[in-house]
Amino acid sequence: MRTLVLICALALAATAQPPNLRLPDESPGIDGIARTLISVFDQAGIVALGEAHQRKLDSNVRIALVRHPDFPKKVRSIVVEFASTTEQPTLDRYIRGDNVSKAQLEQVWKTTTQAANGIWDDPIYADFFAAVRDVNSKLPADARIRVFGGDPGPGDNRSRETAAVAVLKEQVLQRHAKALVIYGAAHFYRAAPNDYLSNMGQDIGIVSMLEKDYPGRTFAVIPVGYRWDLPPSVFDPDYRKFDRALKTQLRPVLVPLQRLPFRDFTAEEFSGPLLNCRGPGGCVSVFKGSALTLGQMADACVYVGAGVDMKAGR
């Protein structure tokens, strides 16, 4: 089911144009990544921070970002995949510091369209809410961060991407504000193989949808580098290419994807483990045979190297 969810998120519009930003060639370490992403908000309205679901390292990066002392000075809104729009009042009460029982809080993610997967039951998602709540406890009421659920939840017939974009337009962009958005990385790809585009209707990717009305406002970041158990049909990434091109040995590291040679690395190799397992031929990469490059897919990546265990979420 999780594979199918990822596949359904891959139907994105023709390549959306990234914002023209100047970033360090390398931002090593979690704190370095957080500092650079904070600076991005000076040049872009939305930072779309893609995650590998249930991975602790990705959780550490986003928590370091929201705990950075400059974050609430620049950003007042966060939109997340792991909360439903229907439970927004509950989430609001928790984030602002009210007493909310564990059972009540769990409804925030248990009422999402993906609740049956159990994916959001991983404690890293509740940890994120707790981190924002803690940050808010030290801020005056008029300077606090608000977290919005982006999943449509029960009774709402909108797609997940349509619901998220509606929240961002109404609560952030139309108010000339700024937001951090946290979703699975596939929702933020700027481009995808044409074979998938004709099957997905209006779900062309959150970034591509935003670019239609607000071009150049969104900065898309995706994770690269995991240890996967791959079927023989899938191209095994050679992360030594990344490692040789980097000066720093510290991981994770934020790398702009308009920088050579990273810009021209193929999506088939480095995003290829995203699988389509629905056809008669077994699991194959959704990028198999595609000429798309990482520079077409996103604006930057958080490179973690080959030693991070994807399934363990560490």
List the model feature ranges, each with a label.
Residues 3-13:
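Bacterial N-terminal signal peptides
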